[in-house]
Regions:
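Short beta-strand/loop motif that positions the catalytic acidic residue
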Residues: 209, 215-217
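Conserved HGGG/HGGXW glycine-rich cap/lid loop of the alpha/beta-hydrolase fold
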Residues: 15-67
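Catalytic histidine-centered segment of alpha/beta-hydrolase-like enzymes
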Residues: 247-259
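Gly/Ala-rich beta-loop-alpha elbow adjacent to hydrolase catalytic centers
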Residues: 100, 104, 108
């Protein structure tokens, strides 16, 4: 049985950051989770619970999301990567492996680039290289640009099939269940997250990421078309691509399928 999450709220650089750690065993390098835009840390719990119970997992709400405070001014990805490193110091972690989902995948790339000695392995799920990405359909991106789906759960459930694709197209209850777990902190935090990625790209330094990297993609992802994950796998030297028969949120909808792939990657020497 995996141990329950231990929640802590910590003060870092003027921010109140809500963290959750699922304790594990010392023979496995802990895994740090960077979540998607507007997504509170509880949304990754089903995925985390599918992983090996010996794997220690660290999750947190970025500033302006869930239980973390909303800063009065915007931030960028390098600043967030620094905040994550400071959080690891505070929680007494040295080296970790990192998984980044969607928006969090950009932050994961930044962290792996800026703190290579802290990041043992990198997992990028349903994400892209930023400003140079091949975008999804305008209607999908327009809906994504608004925090309404997090503030109004019924609207979130209504548009989920169009923006997440995959299993969300087939199972209406999935969208309702997902929407019920969302904990919104309001519009400003969401807009700060959008601003963090404005004009940002990793394309010119992806070749400098030396960590073993697993790129995970869904073949029916309306937000981040598959070609973007192929580009990441092409640009990152020590990477492998794994494509799943699902949409944008395969970590949640296909947790039992994805977890063994991730554990195999993390345990490879």
């Amino acid at each position: 049985m995996p141990l329950p999450f231990v929640f802590r709220t910590i003060d870092l650089d003027g921010n109140t950051i809500r963290t959750a750690v699922r304790p594990g065993k010392p023979h496995l390098t802990p895994l740090l989770v960077f979540n998607g835009i507007g997504a509170n840390l509880e949304l990754v719990f089903p995925f985390v619970n599918a992983l090996d119970p010996d794997l220690e997992v660290i999750a947190f709400d970025v500033p302006g999301v869930g239980g973390s405070s909303t800063p009065s001014s915007p931030y960028r990805f390098p600043g967030l990567a620094k905040l994550a490193a400071r959080m690891l110091d505070y929680l007494d972690y040295g080296q970790v492996s990192v998984i980044g989902v969607s928006w969090g995948g950009a932050l994961a790339q930044q962290f792996a680039h800026d703190y290579p000695e802290r990041c043992k392995k990198l997992i990028l799920a349903a994400t892209a290289a930023g400003a140079v990405m091949v975008p999804g359909k305008p209607k999908v991106l327009w809906r994504m640009a608004s925090p309404r789906r997090y503030i109004q759960p019924s609207y979130g459930a209504h548009i989920a099939p169009d923006i997440y694709g995959g299993a969300f197209r087939r199972d209406k209850n999935l969208a309702l269940s997902f929407a019920s777990k969302v904990r919104s902190s309001g519009k400003l935090g969401y807009y700060w997250q959008l601003f963090a990625g404005l004009g940002w790209t990793s394309i010119h330094w992806l070749h400098k990421i030396k960590q073993p990297t697993l790129v995970l993609a869904g073949d029916d992802d309306p937000l981040i078309p598959l070609v973007n994950m192929r580009m990441l796998a092409w640009r990152i030297p020590n990477s492998q691509l794994h494509v799943l028969d699902d949409g944008h949120l395969f970590l949640i909808t296909r947790a039992e399928t994805v977890a063994p792939i991730i554990m195999k990657f993390l345990q490879e020497e």
